[in-house]
Amino acid sequence: MASKRKSTTPCMIPVKTVVLPGASTEPQPVESLPEGPQQDLPSEAPDASSEAAPNPSSTDGSALANGHRSTLDGYVYCCKECEFRSQDVTHFIGHMNSEHTDFNKDPTFVCTGCSFLAKNPEGLSLHNAKCHSGEASFLWNVTKPDNHVVVEQSVPDSASSSVLAGESTTEGTEIIITKTPIMKIMKGKAEAKKIHMLKENAPNQPGSEALPKPLAGEREVKEGDHTFINGAAPGSQASAKSTKPPPAANGPLIGTVPVLPAGIAQFLSLQQQPPVHAQHHTHQPLPTSKTLPKVMIPLSSIPTYNAAMDSNSFLKNSFHKFPYPTKAELCYLTVVTKYPEEQLKIWFTAQRLKQGISWSPEEIEDARKKMFNTVIQSVPQPTITVLNTPLVASAGNVQHLIQATLPGHAVGQPEGTAGGLLVTQPLMANGLQASSSSLPLTTASVPKPTVAPINTVCSNSASAVKVVNAAQSLLTACPSITSQAFLDANIYKNKKSHEQLSALKGSFCRNQFPGQSEVEHLTKVTGLSTREVRKWFSDRRYHCRNLKGSRAMMPGEHGSVLIDSVPEVPFPLASKVPEVTCIPTATSLVSHPATKRQSWHQTPDFTPTKYKERAPEQLRVLENSFAQNPLPPEEELDRLRSETKMTRREIDGWFSERRKKVNTEETKKADGHMPKEEEEGAEQEGRDEELANELRVPGENGSPEMFLSHALAERKVSPIKINLKNLRVTEASGKSEFPGMGVCEPEEDGLNKLVEQPPSKVSYKKTAQQRHLLRQLFVQTQWPSNQDYDSIMAQTGLPRPEVVRWFGDSRYALKNGQLKWYEDYKRGNFPPGLLVIAPGNRELLQDYYMTHKMLCEEDLQTLCDKTQMSAQQVKQWFAEKMGEETRAVADISSEDQGPRNGEPVAVHKVLGDAYSELSENSESWEPSAPEASSEPFDTSSPQSGRQLEAD
């Protein structure tokens, strides 16, 4: 075995050398095992050797889009025989399989320390995972006795870079740490929390020349550069099917962590590597601990992380269920785990940092909605964002993102500094938050081409950084504004500049629901698209409605964005916005301490409100104003506000709904589409529906009394006109008109027709059986087909226009909630006494009745046998038939007596038809009980009469 030397730097990973006897053959590729360190398999050819050596050109690493370096930077896999180099394991294996024919010979794997024999590298990997899980490196010696390749594995005496169990082995230049994301530097303790620094330029040290020169067949092995999900170091495998393991997702914030005292300036160094495009990556690995800049964390305010909590099953299950626990979940975990709540919060924060989880409050709420189908309000976690100037010089090149749970800290870019940062920290005095202190920080960046300082960030930037405002101060000392109110990362992305936000906020203060003209004006001023403007208004309204206290927006000096956590600037709920809008200056929107605070609720509700419960007086005033101008000016709105005692928002909402209704009605009139099966009755039904829509609007938003008086005043012709020719069309037909009411009642329609009904339109009086059949079909389908119409016409004997009209009236009544019988018929609760008789049986009974005019007792059994009906049903049918005949005779006698006594014709007609109409649309199922109820009667429409019906 060749000699092995330690690096002069104690923290450097030692170089491993594998001795190969002269019988060795081809080199084998680098393989990875999740439980052990990553090694190169020894070569199998005496003249070929392979090593995983650092590539000086790749020490900078592969740059990701967010500025972090790839986990594969620093080393390449090299075949010394071919001088072939590859940074990807799969690519290197492909080379070995194609170029070296003896590579595929299966060796036997032997662990000399445990006398363990394995036939394949997978078996040895499992053995290493079970018996050598704590070892950091292995030494492989390849022999070839009897032409059979044997790989002997031994554990070296010293492994200065051993990694604790459960930790991630990352690249040789990064920091190896425990799972603790926030820690204190414990000097003088050789325990898990001690940080080992691995020298970054170790592969390029000249001391490496002092290594013994490998003999023929010897090869040098260096650990590769991979991280693994389970946190363990990789081992050696010889399978050609292996792929690069996925990178670790637990890259916590690490480094020297000084405490940031309040009011004291400290300097922080940020080292940024130049970006290098990643090669051979199917996906971008997450940033490692080395590539993350170091961020200051006030450790005095954060409890010590307890590593023992990682094995708690309650905590792990809760985190896997949802990474952001609610208050109730924290209380439950406090009880079952016996850990304090603050310790639990720190643990959850650490786990989220490991997994790279950083969600906004909206994302947390949406995720809870999707997972639990509930809405749980969560308090947004304050964040700290650090950016240096070269990163924001290009809107799409924002690479650094550092977030930590620091309450009340904000980071900005002070003017005049090339790489400086401005960190603010709140000052607490007697429990009250005073004005903020600004702490300048310096950053060291790799030299880059100079870029001019910018004041804005492009609106189409797709970065994940919370707030960006480069080359200008993000904080001004203002006594009335707290530093915690300075930054609301949940509302503002880095999409809009100060000028854009000023224009948007100025418009939002005037009207939270901008019109189309205002949106177009904002798009011209800000350069944003219409969709972005509307989305900004929607998001802003959402936060005003859901946050504990609505946050007023005030632009401050030097382009800083200031958001007050207490609403000092009231939002006037104006309904109209002038066409020409002036963009206010930065000082015009600043709230002074003497500003009178409005008394409106701090969390206004922007949900739509129904206005049907308004008093008739209010509706009358609103209707009059709407008739004059559907878009009232400001003076009219003020007058309506004082007269109706309604709020500005309510008035604006009422006018908006009213305009929508008018537009809807106009659209319906323009379209005028009708079902094809209603062609014969389309004209009459269209007039009914059109009139119903006209009358329904005042019933909802206006005063019925005012509308009725207006309609009666316009009527020129009295509707009470009797055409004697139409008094008796059939023995079962008639028409009811009440002269006392002064309007003409349609038979099935509950609306008052304000026009004279044409004499040619005849309303048919329907029997209880006919209504029963119609209702049964209506429950089955509200829009019958042509076949349904033909069938119901055959069953009832009614003409098609009458059936079509009845269905139209019933649909309208159902829409307005006036069809009382619908639910009972839908449940199958039919009125007593109604028979469902087949057409053939009805003809038999009808013929018998026309012959005998009454039911003979001796013929009862014969009729029962022929019709398959019971005796009670046959008797009931004859009773109903005789009742109809009696009513018809009464109609004739009343008509004959009317002119003879000299009374008005209309009065006699009403007296004669009043009872005959009782059975038309009765809602009562007692045949002998007349009821004053109308099935399509609309209470919201103006009514001056009521139909009386009974079965």
Swiss-Prot record:
Coiled coil: none annotated. Residues 42-58, 919-936 have a biased composition (Low complexity). Residues 299-497 are annotated as: Required for repressor activity. Gene3D superfamilies: Classic Zinc Finger, Homeodomain-like. It is found in: Nucleus. The keyword Zinc applies. GO terms for cellular component: cell cortex; nucleoplasm; nucleus. Its main location: nucleus. GO terms for biological process: cell differentiation; negative regulation of DNA-templated transcription; negative regulation of transcription by RNA polymerase II; positive regulation of osteoblast differentiation. Residues 1-107, 492-550 are annotated as: Required for nuclear localization. Residues 300-359, 489-548, 607-666, 759-818, 830-889 bind DNA. SMART domains: HOX (SM00389), ZnF_C2H2 (SM00355). Residues 937-951 have a biased composition (Polar residues). Residues 1-66, 227-252, 662-690, 916-951 are annotated as: Disordered. One of its GO terms (molecular function) is RNA polymerase II transcription regulatory region sequence-specific DNA binding. Keywords: Differentiation, DNA-binding, Homeobox, Metal-binding, Nucleus, Phosphoprotein, Repeat, Repressor, Transcription, Transcription regulation, Zinc, Zinc-finger. Residues 238-483 are annotated as: Required for homodimerization and interaction with NFYA. A zinc finger (C2H2-type) spans 77-100, 109-132. Residues 662-676 have a biased composition (Basic and acidic residues). The keyword Repeat applies. Homodimer (via homeobox domain 1). Heterodimer with ZHX1 (via homeobox domain 1). Heterodimer with ZHX2 (via homeobox domain 1). Heterodimerization with ZHX1 is a prerequisite for repressor activity. Interacts with NFYA. Acts as a transcriptional repressor. Involved in the early stages of mesenchymal stem cell (MSC) osteogenic differentiation. Is a regulator of podocyte gene expression during primary glomerula disease. Binds to promoter DNA. Belongs to the ZHX family. This is Zinc fingers and homeoboxes protein 3. The gene is Zhx3.
